[in-house]
């Protein structure tokens, strides 16, 4: 079947995440021949009326190649040096390859700080949407040259999920050096079977994903599973597929794609809750009892002080926190109505007691249900 015969009928916004292993083919240099093929497929998508956003790895590999593979110490500063040199080289390669098909690109470098603050989050969203609306392909990467651990997203798998939320994507393609998610590591177990479709992400699946990435990249199957979970909750279908297979982008978007397809949740989150889910790094944790877990998960209730067991970390009123059960399983993310100091005083108390304990109150809810995203299946 030809590329044109694989045409996708309904216009879609597609985020294509390209890992280092896909761009280098396992070598130490960018594989421009394969990159031009990926650009061709993206160009074909645009010709058919779809919008394409690229999340690209490879800056460090490009920097190492450009500098002649220097022997550098294994330090953050070395990686930032390589990223600083390589990012410009990487974007030049993409610019030249897309130019073959008459397509202009726009570079966007993001850090966690750009997503933590809602106003900056919305500004990033407006920029990426403006590029798409003007026929320009956004090429996104994390700003590794300046990002520290405190402001890093950490890997381009999770970054691509956040970008998908920013641009309201219909599909997210996580292209990697594996054919998809298997029942075991196919590099170690010859009996490993490809999982074709996923409707629920549970602890068993997380255990299967395990492991880390390649020596050149930062992401492995575990981070892809995290990214898939974030994206599908925002109404984005996710496909993990082999990035060097022929016509992989078109095959991934067919009715029966190669690889593993993660179905989007039917009830997609509203925009504010998408930001709570994807934007800010959690400032602290609120541990709740079993009754509160049931109320939050099954009844859609707000979290009250009565159900709080303890707090962990430091956070101010209005910051995003994680909600955990007593076994430290993630139950929800939400915006705290009280600081950690305030919560420590009112934990386990009835709402009517708050004003007597603190001398004031910010309402009866510790986290209002409109400010909370339930995570557990």
Curated annotation (Swiss-Prot):
Q: Does the keyword Amino-acid biosynthesis apply?
A: yes
Name the Gene Ontology molecular function terms of this record: ATP binding; glutamate 5-kinase activity; RNA binding
Q: Which reaction does it catalyse?
A: L-glutamate + ATP = L-glutamyl 5-phosphate + ADP
User: Which InterPro entries does the entry link to?
Assistant: AceGlu_kinase-like_sf, Asp/Glu/Uridylate_kinase, G5K_ProB, Glu/AcGlu_kinase, Glu_5kinase, Glu_5kinase/COase_Synthase, Glutamate_5-kinase_CS, PUA
Per the record, GO CC terms? Answer: cytosol
Which biological process annotations from GO are given for this protein?
L-proline biosynthetic process; proline biosynthetic process
In what pathway does it function? Amino-acid biosynthesis; L-proline biosynthesis; L-glutamate 5-semialdehyde from L-glutamate: step 1/2
Per the record, a Pfam family? AA_kinase
| Residue ranges constituting the PUA domain according to the UniProt record | 283-361
What SUPFAM superfamilies does UniProt report for this protein, alphabetically?
Answer: Carbamate kinase-like, PUA domain-like
Coiled coil location: none
Q: Which domain of life is it from?
A: Bacteria
Q: Does the keyword field hold NAD?
A: no
Keywords of the record: Amino-acid biosynthesis, ATP-binding, Cytoplasm, Kinase, Nucleotide-binding, Proline biosynthesis, Transferase
Q: Which residues bind substrate?
A: 57, 144, 156
Location comes to: Cytoplasm
Residue numbers binding ATP:
17, 176-177, 218-224
- The record's EC number reads 2.7.2.11
Physiological role: Catalyzes the transfer of a phosphate group to glutamate to form L-glutamate 5-phosphate.
Q: Which family does it belong to?
A: Belongs to the glutamate 5-kinase family.
| Name of the featured protein | Glutamate 5-kinase
Per the UniProt record, the source organism is Vibrio cholerae serotype O1 (strain ATCC 39315 / El Tor Inaba N16961)
Gene assigned in the entry: proB
């Amino acid at each position: 079947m030809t590329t044109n015969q694989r045409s996708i009928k309904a216009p879609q916004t597609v985020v294509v995440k390209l890992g280092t292993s896909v761009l280098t083919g396992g070598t130490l240099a960018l594989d421009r021949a394969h990159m031009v093929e990926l650009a061709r497929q993206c160009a074909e998508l645009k010709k058919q009326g779809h919008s394409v956003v690229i999340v690209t790895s490879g800056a460090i590999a490009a920097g190492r190649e450009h500098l002649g593979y220097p022997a550098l110490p294994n330090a953050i500063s070395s990686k930032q040096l390589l990223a600083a040199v390589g990012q410009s080289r990487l974007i030049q390669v993409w610019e030249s390859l897309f130019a073959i098909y008459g397509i202009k690109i726009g570079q966007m470098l993001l850090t966690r700080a750009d997503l933590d603050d809602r106003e900056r989050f919305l500004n990033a969203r407006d920029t990426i949407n403006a590029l798409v609306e003007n026929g320009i392909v956004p090429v996104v990467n994390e700003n590794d040259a300046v990002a520290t651990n405190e402001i890093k997203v950490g890997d381009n798998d999770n970054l691509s999920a956040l970008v998908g939320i920013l641009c309201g994507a219909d599909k997210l393609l996580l292209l990697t050096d594996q054919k998809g998610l298997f029942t075991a590591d196919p590099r170690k177990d010859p009996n490993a079977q490809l999982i074709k479709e996923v409707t629920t992400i549970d602890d068993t699946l997380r255990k299967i994903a395990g492991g880390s990435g390649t020596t050149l990249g930062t992401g492995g199957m575990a981070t892809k599973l995290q990214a898939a979970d974030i994206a599908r909750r925002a109404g984005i279908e996710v496909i993990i597929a082999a990035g060097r297979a022929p016509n992989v982008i078109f095959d991934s978007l067919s009715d029966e794609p190669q690889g593993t397809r993660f179905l989007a949740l039917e009830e997609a989150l509203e925009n504010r809750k998408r930001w709570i889910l994807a934007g800010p790094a959690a400032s602290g944790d609120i541990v709740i009892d079993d009754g509160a877990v049931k109320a939050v998960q099954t009844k859609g209730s707000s979290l009250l002080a009565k159900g709080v067991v303890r707090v962990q970390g430091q956070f101010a009123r209005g910051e995003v926190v994680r909600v955990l059960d007593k076994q430290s399983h993630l139950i929800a993310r939400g915006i705290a109505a009280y600081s950690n100091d305030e919560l420590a005083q009112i934990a386990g108390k009835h709402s009517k007691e708050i004003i007597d304990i603190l001398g004031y109150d910010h309402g009866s809810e510790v986290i209002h249900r409109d400010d909370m995203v339930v995570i557990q299946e």
